[in-house]
Amino acid sequence: MRIKKIFITTTFDCNLRCKYCFEHNKTNLYIDVNKMQAILQKEFCDSGSYDLFSITFHGGEPFLAFEEIKKICEWTWKNYSNYNILFAATTNGTITNENIKTWLRQHKKHFNIILSIDGKKEYHNLNRGKSFDMIDFDFFLSTYSRPWVKMTVTPNTVEHMYENFIYLQQLGFNTNPTLACEIDWNEKTDLYKIKKELYKLVQYYISNPTERPGDLLSLPIEKLITNKDIYTTRCSLGSGYVAFDVLGNQYPCQNFIADFSKPYSAESINECVNLINQNDYRKITEICINCVIKEVCSPCYGLNYSNRASMGSVDKVWCYITKVLVYFNAYLIIKALTNGKQYIWLKDKSQIEIATLATAAKEIINLKNQLL
């Protein structure tokens, strides 16, 4: 399926001030509906034969601009009913009043929600203010079938990652634990805690074959084999991705918009796009050339650019974290392929793909001393 992914920043404003948020210098700018409708019209006309348009609203907190979202969605459904279009929003879930709830219920087949909840109340509130009790859990769980939750893990909650994951799973959410980016991880003490929690997550997925692993444990480790001596860019940016800020400025993806105070530079963004289109990671992240997992790793060019002014300026601690993640991905594959259970996330793979995964996993396990 060919998917066009469009990311729209509805506002630079947010009602929360999460400690780990990498979107800096929030302002009360909001999206212009007419301008965004014109942008979407062009995207639909120019995008060719895509099977699906996936349009995701970001913020800030996107539902601060609910009326704008509503107008854009209803205009799109009216004028492009012959297109397969799915909307979504990533939200903290704290401002969904009855008006928003009614609208979401009416359009739940065409408008998905990704909630930001970090686990139990005591751990969620550590980084997200006293916002836990502001979320209507019953509404989201009754409206959507196992709604997705992005559970952000930070140094002050990492040793409770598995505990918080299980808590949200048992509530009925589909939980995706992620490690916070662009914050101060300690490469010794925090890495040790990450390893312990990842081991528990692996055991969970091994014991629950109908559950699909989240982002931390679904890295494409087969690329260690399939991308050997291939130097394509390690990010999936390309013609299938585009992002727009509240002013309608275009970016390769939403992570290029992390600093809301930074003035837009079309020249700088065009340079990034041209470099990405050359499709050779060596021209972007030279530091990766001799890395043993370079085929698997996907450094975030957007966060590098928005936080350190260069797509090739990587967060060194994140390199250590990624090596740990790759190892535990391989460990999960080895366990899954040797215990005789049928895993939902493996059943659609061919025998050749399974064999490639197994080979890659074994090679990675043999690199244990370099990764851990």
Labelled PLM ranges:
Residues F7-T10, C14, I284-I287, I293, ...:
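Short metal-coordination and nucleic-acid-contact micro-motifs, chiefly zinc-binding Cys/His arrays
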Residues N290-L372:
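Radical SAM enzyme core and accessory elements
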